């Protein structure tokens, strides 16, 4: 009887030790895997944002996202003719409103006035200006509600589907397109957000 009890006791002890060992192995595996997973997410996030930035710094976006009071024009980013100004609401000065030339559709002639609904610059209260910024500075500006029109990251996704933003992929004759399609751009934006919205240094 004593031998049976001893064997049973030994069996229970062995099982307990094996269970404990297995638990320790799992904990160590999780501890070693977590930093790697976080690092991989950060790397994916940074790669995605670099692609997002390639669109945001193309002439179709950059010409209106300027720190100065007047927009730019063309693929060479030259100052807008007629001394156009941002105005108090981003839609031009009182004397020369944007809609005076920019209608809801592009003009059919080469380099004619482009058009889309709500044609305007970002207003002075939230100029969303990133011309001249590094990729990291652009990233942090885009995430900052005080600089991005008081938008959350999810709001940015919605904003990128507006007719004015979509115009960049239908800019009219004589203007180059952004380096990604609109679908690719939005996909990279979502990927950047879903993987932590990491910013380059």
What are these regions (language model features)?
Residues 1-53, 73, 84-89, 108-201:
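N-terminal export/targeting leaders of redox proteins
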Residues 44-45, 80-81, 101:
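Short amphipathic alpha-helical surface micro-motifs
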Residues 47, 59, 93-96, 184:
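Short, well-structured alpha-helical interface segments that form or flank functional binding sites
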Residues 57-91:
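N-terminal, post-signal-peptide region of Sec/Tat-exported proteins
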Residues 59-68, 95-105, 189:
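The canonical Cys-X-X-Cys-His
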